Amino acid sequence: MRSNTFGSVMRISWVVAFITMVQTLVSGVPLTDNDLESEVSKGTWFIKYYLPSCGACKRLGPMWDNMVEKAKEQVEGSNFHFGEVDCSKELSSCANIRAVPTLYLYQNGEIVEEVPFGASTSEASLLDFVETHLNPDTDPDIPSDEDVLTDEDTEEVASIQPALSTSVSSLSLASTAMSKSASASEFSGSSVTKASKKLTSSPTSVASKKATLSSVSKVASTSSLPVTSVSASVDPKSAASKVQDAEFSIQTAPSFPKEKEEKENTEETEESKKSINPTGTSKALALDADIDAALTDKEGWFIQFYSSECDDCDDVSTAWYAMANRMRGKLNVAHINCAVSKRACKQYSIQYFPTFLFFKEEAFVEYVGLPNEGDLVSFAEEAANFEIREVELLDTVNAEKNGDVFFLYFYDDDSAEYLNIIRKTGIQLLGHANLYLTTSQQIAKKYRVVSFPKLIVVRDGIASYYPAKMAQDNKDYRRILGWMKNNWLPVLPELRTSNSKEIFNDESVVLFLLNPELDDFDETKRTAQKIATEFLDEEGRTYQSNWQKETDKKNSLVNEAEEKNDLEAIEAAKNFHVNGKPSPTRFAWVNGKFWAQWLRKFDIDIEATGPRVIVYNAAQDIYWDETAKGTPISIEKDTVFDIIKQVETDPDHLKFKILKKNLGVEYLESYGLNIRVLYMVLGIVTVGILVWYFSGRRARTLQRRRHSTPILPVSMRSTGNSGKFD
């Protein structure tokens, strides 16, 4: 018996050790207060400081794990290590950490560099950082002995017959489709520039991996062979397979820029960076000229509007200056005293202090987060990296992989007039989502976009579409921005105080009430996520199909009218409204423990009932928590889908419940009276009673005065007393 028990314990120990080893290999060494200082004192350490509850840390997590997994072969045998510090447990180690996530590079126990985390942080950028510090003595612009082409290599390249008739400067993987007959073998005769170490094993490179930019350019200059480069933004492990299986886009363009032009561009970029917040402080703006220059600067300014009479502004100043110091060389930071510069504060309707606004090229957005250093730095990092850029298919794939919510605007030459309106909305999305532009037919096919222009939002890989019924809707800035604000949350966000207004802004919200303390919480949450994703995907397909039918009908009417040359019919056909509206239903999950008191209004105790689903209409304060058969709504796809359809199409078929309030209001609402109507009726009745009371009092006073005399008091008027009063 003892031997069996001992054997079981040993097997469990081996399993735990194996799992720990795998986690260590993938995510890095977990460091504690006891061993952090001793470990980092030897060699080079790249360490992530994080909090499990931090949203930014959760976004960084997959990128960090994938980076460590891909870099472990490169760092094997070297003195380079990866580590992680959980700041919720290791308080001493995180005493000097002002914001999470923070990435530090240690060499022999000293911090030598910090990697800023922001919107531009990606798995590729982290890998590049690691590669740079693995080979600190290697200059990528200087070819090593192994990189220089030998005479034999030169003869081999010179003898190759060019497979393309035009000069080619970029080969973009997974971009616009080319004929599938163009396989990788057609490029086997091209010399490929060594744009990155990651591509040295790619089959697109038939010339030796020794070929560098300078040597290939030299060979190309003495022969008719066109120089071909390969985009470096390709996954190193899948590059070989992608070249054979992916579709290609060949873009004809001039050959490599001259060294002089490259040097000038580099100098301009470095000069621009030097001019951005060079001292790492907040600049005081007082003169109108300085203020106007800052507010219209293309580099962007993060500005605090305050008043010298504001007590709260003094409390914020420490965090503000600390943020400004961390934005050295990244983002311009300033402050404006509204007691002195009244014009600027009046121009931007500053109502309270302090107010934080980010300006870029005359557009601005208000920061509404907490005024502490960590939150200010997070927003400032995103503001520093803010841009609205053109994207291709690979960019959208990476954004989906990172779990980002992003808006995508499709346009062509005929719809370019709407671009300024769309660009104007971009800065309003700062801190919530990214805005991208594209003309790619491949991306349009992926997201089932059948006509341009079209604005969509992609959440967890699922596209939802801006409902533009007529061309004028694409010019309506407020309507577009309102739709964006209603859709910048993920498919299944967690209900929080900060986002509750956005979540309950729609007609109905499907709430998954979960208990994080249960063992199957993660599995249940994944099921809820899958249900929400599949519903929105199905709704997107239905909406696009109906939109296409309506559009075809409109085009048919226009063509018929033009054939008959009927001007009135042509005008009527062009004014034909394309009907169609996406489902307004939104999804969210609720922490039943945290929101226990609020859930009592629904007569729900999550600990007693377990996970369940309700459909809540916040505008009318009504909800559905049972099926037509009277059973609770379970977290199952068919059940949830049926309830949503019934609520949207025939809400009277299901018996709704009213949010629990005081007994009097609840009783009246049970007869179908709306709470707002009740308040209005109550107000009218109250005013009526007051008018009746004061009117009666006034009438009685006037009546008394009519029956009184100027000589006798009222009490003696009917006594019959007469006589002398002297």
Curated annotation (Swiss-Prot):
The chain crosses the membrane at residues 675-695. It comes from the Eukaryota. Keywords: Membrane, Phosphoprotein, Transmembrane, Transmembrane helix. It is a single-pass membrane protein. Residues 133-153, 227-280 are annotated as: Disordered. Its main location: membrane. GO terms for cellular component: endoplasmic reticulum; Golgi apparatus; membrane. It is found in: Membrane. Disulfide bonds: none annotated. InterPro entries: PDI_TMX3, Thioredoxin-like_sf, Thioredoxin_domain. The keyword Lipid biosynthesis does not apply. Residues 10-135 form the Thioredoxin domain. GO terms for biological process: protein folding in endoplasmic reticulum. GO terms for molecular function: protein disulfide isomerase activity. The modification Phosphoserine is found at S708. Residues 138-153 have a biased composition (Acidic residues). This is Uncharacterized protein C3D6.13c. It comes from Schizosaccharomyces pombe (strain 972 / ATCC 24843) (Fission yeast). The lineage of its organism: Eukaryota, Fungi, Dikarya, Ascomycota, Taphrinomycotina.
